């Protein structure tokens, strides 16, 4: 038992658990393993999203909080370059007034957006936290039922298990699968438009969103779409590892 049981040990779940634990709360994290969907080689933290350049809700505040928190645990690679078509520049400029940025010939550099490596971040966030490794089979309020017959409950249950376990609590949502390729080339400054390049990773979301969770295998069309997007950004096709 604990005051707060966090179901899921990805970046979201471990961040919440660590913040509560640092404030003296009795916390227990329940997960099969560290990470799940939070284990790609690179994670991009960028408040200006998509081809429509939508500023995330409370994007400025969230970015400042992410810089301050994640920077305690792992190196942050500052700067995300967003190519911006000429016709979109007035619209984008109006959304950047409170973000530190610099216009360049082809677009805008978000100077405090960044990328990081999630795997060392997960390990550092988990240090010292009470972590129960196990597969959750069901939610029978107030109990989480684990494989093997174990049961866990908390005064508060926080779900942070992503799309894979959402059915346990009857949660619904739109799931958008993505693909990340590991590269032989290295991009110290992230660049993002349709796809993103950062460090030794190329990623993006090619498939349409779905109501139910599934993990589709990569397709030749998806890989080709990523490589075409990368070529449009940097003028050549990066080498895939």
What are these regions (language model features)?
Residues 132-144:
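A conserved short coil-to-beta-strand element within the FAD-binding core of flavoproteins
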Residues 154-191, 219-222, 233-238:
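Central helical "cap/lid" subdomain
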């Amino acid at each position: 038992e604990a005051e707060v049981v966090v179901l899921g040990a990805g970046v979201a779940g471990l961040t919440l658990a660590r913040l509560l634990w640092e404030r003296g709360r009795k916390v227990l994290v329940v997960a099969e393993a560290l990470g799940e969907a939070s284990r790609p080689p690179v994670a991009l933290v960028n408040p200006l999203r998509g081809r429509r350049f939508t500023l995330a809700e409370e994007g400025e505040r969230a970015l400042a909080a992410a810089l301050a928190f994640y920077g305690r645990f792992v190196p942050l690679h500052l700067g995300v370059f967003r190519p911006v078509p000429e016709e979109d520049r007035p619209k984008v400029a109006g959304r950047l007034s409170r973000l530190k940025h610099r216009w360049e010939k082809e677009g805008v550099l978000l100077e405090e957006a960044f990328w990081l490596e999630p795997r060392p971040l997960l390990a550092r966030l988990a240090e010292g936290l009470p972590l129960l490794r196990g597969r959750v089979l069901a939610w029978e309020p107030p109990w989480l039922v684990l494989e093997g017959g174990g049961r866990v409950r908390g005064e508060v249950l926080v779900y942070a298990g992503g799309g894979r376990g959402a059915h346990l609590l009857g949660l619904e949502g739109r799931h958008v699968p993505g693909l990340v390729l590991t590269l032989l080339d290295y991009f110290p400054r992230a660049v993002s438009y349709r796809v993103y390049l950062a460090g030794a990773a190329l990623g993006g979301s090619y498939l349409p969103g779905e109501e139910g969770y599934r993990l589709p295998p990569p397709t030749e069309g998806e890989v080709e779409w990523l490589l075409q997007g990368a070529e449009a950004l940097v003028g050549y096709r990066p080498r895939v590892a």
